[in-house]
């Protein structure tokens, strides 16, 4: 069985996008309780442990470092994808998910186009988003815990905007980028 280079690169790119979507489900906080004998507070990167005087402890863990590590891995994977793209002389590929209206003169479908512009933008966007998230975690604790979630959704909307090959996905990506930039600017002003 021979796998074409286009199929390999498209599957790597689709898996990168699926993993970006999976960050949305893992960006919540986790709180657990246990009993300990001493009281005090212990805090380290992304997690804190508060021990009360009665011996119970509350773990509070945010997934900021986990999201950053996933984005670092995806940025590295997209670099490999970019090098494969250059080395294998990749042809653009159009992936159609569904045809909504097929009885009209123009078929309305959800389709995305993987071309050299998108592959380069995917690599640049992942590296820039990873460095922004890494800097924001190292810079200090943000009182708003939704910053990683909003940045990830913003990245996903930018990717939808750049790879869309249908008017509906173009509109969805454009509106998502506009709305998320409004939310991120509003969050930074508070």
From Swiss-Prot:
Topology relative to the membrane: Multi-pass membrane protein
Top-level class of the enzyme under EC nomenclature: translocase
TM segment ranges: 1-21, 68-88, 94-114, 118-138, 146-166, 167-187
Gene Ontology MF: a single term: NADH dehydrogenase (ubiquinone) activity
Transport listed as a keyword: yes
Record-linked Pfam families: Proton_antipo_N
GO CC entries: mitochondrial inner membrane
Main location per the UniProt record: mitochondrion
Biological process, per Gene Ontology: ATP synthesis coupled electron transport; electron transport coupled proton transport
Catalytic reactions on record: a ubiquinone + NADH + 5 H(+)(in) = a ubiquinol + NAD(+) + 4 H(+)(out)
E.C. designation(s): 7.1.1.2
Record's keyword annotation contains tRNA processing: no
Keywords, alphabetical: Electron transport, Membrane, Mitochondrion, Mitochondrion inner membrane, NAD, Respiratory chain, Translocase, Transmembrane, Transmembrane helix, Transport, Ubiquinone
Subcellular location: Mitochondrion inner membrane
Family: Belongs to the complex I subunit 5 family.
Protein role: Core subunit of the mitochondrial membrane respiratory chain NADH dehydrogenase (Complex I) that is believed to belong to the minimal assembly required for catalysis. Complex I functions in the transfer of electrons from NADH to the respiratory chain. The immediate electron acceptor for the enzyme is believed to be ubiquinone.
Protein name listed in UniProt: NADH-ubiquinone oxidoreductase chain 5
Organism: Arbacia lixula (Black urchin)
